[in-house]
Amino acid sequence: MKKQLIIGTRSSPLALWQAEYTKAELSRHFPDLDITLKLVKTTGDVLLDSPLSKIGDMGLFTKDIEKFLIAKEIDLAVHSLKDVPTATPEGLIISAFTEREDTRDVIISKNGVKMLDLPKNAKVATSSLRRMSQLKSLRPDFDIKDIRGNLNTRFQKFDEGEFDAMMLAYAGVYRLNFSDRISEILPHEIMLPAVGQGALGIETRVDDEQTREIVKVMNHSNTEYCCKAERSLLRHLQGGCQIPIGSYASFKNGTLHLLAFVGSVDGTKGIRNEITKTGLTSPAQAEAAGIELAEELLKQGAEEILSEIRKTC
């Protein structure tokens, strides 16, 4: 068994929370392990002047950390799973999916105003095409503004009065103790989350069997089923672009329920569908369900929507 582990992580407050959480959990199970953190500045942390959708790189927040992992300068990488591309680099693997936090999105607004009660032409901040598409389908009048930076920076920009509201993932808001700022938690019926939202993905080298065995204690089986279904769906649809796709899976007693959304950026077109599969006994079956639902969405017209988006990316 290894005596030392080096965890690679971004240096943002949320990324550090995630890495420290992982360190604490591993230390609880393996108290003799010497665990340290290596902070890595990623492309996504540096390129803050452009919207994520315009940069177009699928590994903005992960690939720079993965370089250290491939070079054996770190033993594992801790990511927000929603930031991890569905195809990992050769030689790397997601070895653990941590138990998921609440997957929903939240609205932060002035005076606690709920989303549908925001004034006409309200300025709503988000960096996500997925959120933009679903927001515009509900409120075409919204003036969507791009916002970048870590969570603390976003709250600072909001407090300076640049926006009427902003949309964030509940998980990050909760983990960094901003829950008292939440104006509304949006149900999945109107806002499907990003694939993998709320979970952490712990990435290792495929051939590092000792580390893979160690991080298995962090794996949450239900989360693995759900996230593999969602990631399989996204992989089948994506084609290398930042596109407005939302998905949420639940899994209990062998039954998987998977919801998905594909929409145009301006919110004028949107397709939702769902699938339920019973008797599942392996994550591979959950992945197959993701592909099946992706095919249904394509038949419903998702291909037309995605083709239009790919012309601009």
From Swiss-Prot:
GO terms for molecular function: hydroxymethylbilane synthase activity. It is an enzyme of class 2 (transferase). It catalyses: 4 porphobilinogen + H2O = hydroxymethylbilane + 4 NH4(+). Its cofactor is dipyrromethane. The keyword Transmembrane does not apply. It comes from the Bacteria. Pathway: Porphyrin-containing compound metabolism; protoporphyrin-IX biosynthesis; coproporphyrinogen-III from 5-aminolevulinate: step 2/4; Porphyrin-containing compound metabolism; chlorophyll biosynthesis. This is Porphobilinogen deaminase.
